[in-house]
């Protein structure tokens, strides 16, 4: 009997020992499994945090550049400012804020610039501002822009004083301009955001695009880069204007064309940045003289040839315009409207007789 009790006790002890070992193994195994699970979860969290957050883009699209801007700014009419471009008038002020710049010859083979602005709100100095030539009015009308100038040729005065174009000039809003003492007249006339806006308010011009106005250009979509099918490389573009002798140089890193004139970089003195653009359009036009024998006029209706330059390449294009107050369309060799890369554009009017002076090279 005593012997049986010992056997039973031994068996019970063995069972208890086995149970304890089993519990330890289970506990140890569970702990190990838990650590693996935690490691997996930790790794997942680390991978998630490395994904960059996306910033919501403004909902508006610029009519001038195709880029995202605020909806309020996107529906606002641009202003077009006439820039003096002789050597006594540089450096320019505020022009780096422009989305579109037109360059065209005037008397004496010099050029003037017309800069189209959407956002000029912070600019205290814009210019120097110079006088109007009639064909610049038609450039401004293509963009439904309010045209700012100081003075005008006698051939433009009647048009400016009619209701054909909303304009801010010396004859109707002289208080919107001011003169500086660092240059001699007439190269020292400037305006500002405050001067422009107060003049527009005084003259009662509407501030939003007219109903039904559509974007002048078609632009590449976000994250899209237009690469022309042409094999013609365009790393340097000389425009052929004889006085300021401007040219652009392509920077492959940022896809921009940087501008030079008068033998040096073309700088905006308000931010000390060199002017640059994503697109260049060269439009060959016929030009004649008015009866005074010196004032230039341009034929902007009909059709003609030109160049479209972007992303390091150039292709031949044709341009068409049915009526003076209409829109100029630029067509590729297949007859389709060109698509521009997002960003600034420089549009250059070159007289047909000087077309061979335009040089596009590697």
Task: Please place each PLM-identified region on the residue numbering.
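N-terminal Sec-pathway targeting helices
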Residues: 2-16
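Compositionally biased non-globular segments, especially hydrophobic aliphatic-rich helices
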Residues: 12-15, 30, 45-52
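Hydrophobic single-pass membrane-insertion segments
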Residues: 23-36
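A surface/extracellular/periplasmic glyco- and lipid-processing/surface-interacting theme
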Residues: 2-4, 38-41, 46-102, 107-362
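ASCE RecA-like P-loop NTPase motor cores
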Residues: 19-21
């Amino acid at each position: 009997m005593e012997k049986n009790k010992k056997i039973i006790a031994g068996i019970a002890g063995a069972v208890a020992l086995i149970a304890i070992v089993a519990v330890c193994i289970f506990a140890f195994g569970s702990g190990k499994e838990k650590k693996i699970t935690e490691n997996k979860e930790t790794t997942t969290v680390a991978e998630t945090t490395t994904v960059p957050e996306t910033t919501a883009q403004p909902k508006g699209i610029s009519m001038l550049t195709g880029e995202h801007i605020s909806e309020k700014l996107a529906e606002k009419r641009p202003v077009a400012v006439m820039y003096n471009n002789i050597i006594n008038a540089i450096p320019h002020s505020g022009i780096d804020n422009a989305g579109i710049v037109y360059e065209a010859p005037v008397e004496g083979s010099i050029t003037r610039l017309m800069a189209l602005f959407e956002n000029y709100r912070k600019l205290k100095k814009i210019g120097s501002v110079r006088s109007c030539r009639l064909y610049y009015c038609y450039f401004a009308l293509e963009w439904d822009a309010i045209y700012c100038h100081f003075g005008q040729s006698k051939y433009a005065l009647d048009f400016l004083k009619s209701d054909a174009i909303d304009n801010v000039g010396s004859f109707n809003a002289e208080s919107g301009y001011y003169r500086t003492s660092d240059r001699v007249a007439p190269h020292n006339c400037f305006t500002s955001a405050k001067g422009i806006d107060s003049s527009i308010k005084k003259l009662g011009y509407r501030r939003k695009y007219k109903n039904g106005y559509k974007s002048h250009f078609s632009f590449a979509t976000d994250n899209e880069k237009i690469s022309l099918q042409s094999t013609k490389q365009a790393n340097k573009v000389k425009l052929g204007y004889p006085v300021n002798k401007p040219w652009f140089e392509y920077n492959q890193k940022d896809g921009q064309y940087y501008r030079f004139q008068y033998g040096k970089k073309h700088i905006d003195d308000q931010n000390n940045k060199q002017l640059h653009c994503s697109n260049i359009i060269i439009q060959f036009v016929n030009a004649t003289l008015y009866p005074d024998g010196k004032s230039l006029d341009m034929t902007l209706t009909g059709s003609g040839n030109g160049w479209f330059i972007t992303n390091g390449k150039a292709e031949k294009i044709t341009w068409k315009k049915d009526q003076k107050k209409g829109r100029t369309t630029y067509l590729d060799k297949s007859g389709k409207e060109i698509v521009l890369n997002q960003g600034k554009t420089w549009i250059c009017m070159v007289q047909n007789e000087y077309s061979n002076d335009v040089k596009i090279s590697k």
